[in-house]
A protein has these predicted regions:
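Alpha-helical transmembrane segments of multi-pass membrane proteins
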Residues: 103-105, 118-141, 279
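Membrane-interface helix-loop junctions in multi-pass transport and translocation proteins
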Residues: 7, 165-199
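Helix-terminus/linker motif at the lipid-water interface of multi-pass membrane proteins
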Residues: 30-49, 111-118, 174-181, 241-274, ...
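Small-residue-rich hydrophobic transmembrane alpha-helices
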Residues: 48-102, 138-157, 265-309
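Signature of the first transmembrane helix
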Residues: 12-73, 77, 234-254
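Membrane-embedded alpha-helical segments of multi-pass transporters/permeases
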Residues: 33, 37, 64, 98, ...
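Residue-level recognition of pore/gate-forming positions within transmembrane alpha-helices
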Residues: 21, 29, 56-59, 94, ...
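Interhelical loop/hinge segments that connect adjacent transmembrane helices in multipass membrane
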Residues: 1-16, 190, 202-243
Length: 309
């Protein structure tokens, strides 16, 4: 599973790493758009608004998680490049600890952030209640993906999200169509498919030899490790979070203008999110390749990575 990014053609390494990541990001975007599209095919405007508002909150949480995971990817990659698997194990364990703390602190404030039209309140509450059950699985998926990417493997996370995306579409059609569960069906499809992606990811870790041996000691908070993860991951999370805050402000304004405006804005925001696929892919690629090369004492290759990207 581990891929050495410190030798060979830098340009080839960028393409090999970036393309699977780009496809993964596209599938994640498709994941959210599928909920809205299928809901729109079988339900009314109130259900579309409920799913749009609920998914906006979930996307905000996901952006925070993915941003922090970037810090983990860099620290793991640096440790792998230096051949120090003990530091990589500490980074993985402390990432799990950090994510759990962030989720506990962030969920309630985000839920109370947006004002939902009265007609869509029941559906939004139902959607979020079920999706919150899936938050640990979102976290687990991103932690496992950051481990794979830190080891230089961006293909495995792509396979994990592809399985989840296919399952989500199939379950959405079943739950929202024949079973007529509306927003509840969309949330169930999302949560169950996220659970499946984590199961597949755990199987991937078990099947491949990573050279990592995690123990309880690795999960103990270490100030130095957490500091390095946050130093890199927090600015990324804040940067992407600010973009999502802008979207949420637009959502709040649309919510106060009525049901139809709220639904329309929710759909457009899903389309706009697709525009961030390429820059986000390049950010992840530069982070993974540079961290391994800096860890291996090859700053010139890290500089070449930035130049080519």
């Amino acid at each position: 599973m581990e891929k050495n990014l410190t030798t060979g053609s830098v340009f080839k390494a960028i393409l090999t790493f970036a393309l699977p990541y780009l496809l993964s990001y596209f599938l994640q975007t498709l994941y959210g758009m599928a909920d809205l599209y299928i809901t729109g095919r079988f339900c009314g405007v109130d259900s579309i608004t409920a799913v749009a508002n609920g998914s906006q909150v979930m996307h905000m949480l996901t952006v925070i998680i993915v941003g922090l995971a970037m810090g983990s990817t860099v620290i793991i990659g640096h440790a792998v490049g230096a051949g120090n698997m003990r530091d990589a194990e500490d980074a993985i364990g402390n990432t799990v600890t950090l994510f759990m703390a962030v989720l506990v602190a962030a969920v309630r404030p985000l839920v109370g952030l947006i004002g939902v039209p009265a007609e869509a309140v029941p559906g939004t509450v139902q959607y979020l209640t079920i999706c919150f059950i899936g938050i640990p699985f979102i976290t687990a998926y991103n932690i496992i993906s950051s481990v794979f990417r830190g080891l230089g493997d961006s293909k495995s996370p792509m396979y994990f999200i592809a399985v989840a995306c296919a399952a989500n579409i199939a379950l959405d059609i079943l739950f929202i169509g024949p079973m007529a569960l509306g927003p509840v069906g969309a949330a169930l499809g999302t949560t169950l498919s996220q659970t499946l992606s984590v199961i597949v990811a755990l199987f991937g870790i078990w099947r491949h030899k990573t050279g990592l041996r995690l123990s309880r000691q690795n999960f103990r908070p270490r100030k130095g490790v957490l500091g390095r993860i946050l130093k890199i991951g927090l600015p990324v999370a804040v940067q992407d979070g600010c973009i999502q805050v802008a979207f949420i402000i637009i959502t709040i304004i649309a919510n106060h203008r009525g049901l139809i405006d709220s639904a329309a804005v929710g759909i457009v925001e899903k389309i706009i999110s697709a525009m961030f696929i390429v820059p986000s892919s390049m950010l992840a690629t530069v982070s993974a390749l540079s961290s391994q090369n800096l860890g291996a004492g090859k700053p010139e290759r890290a500089a070449q990575t930035l130049k080519y990207a």
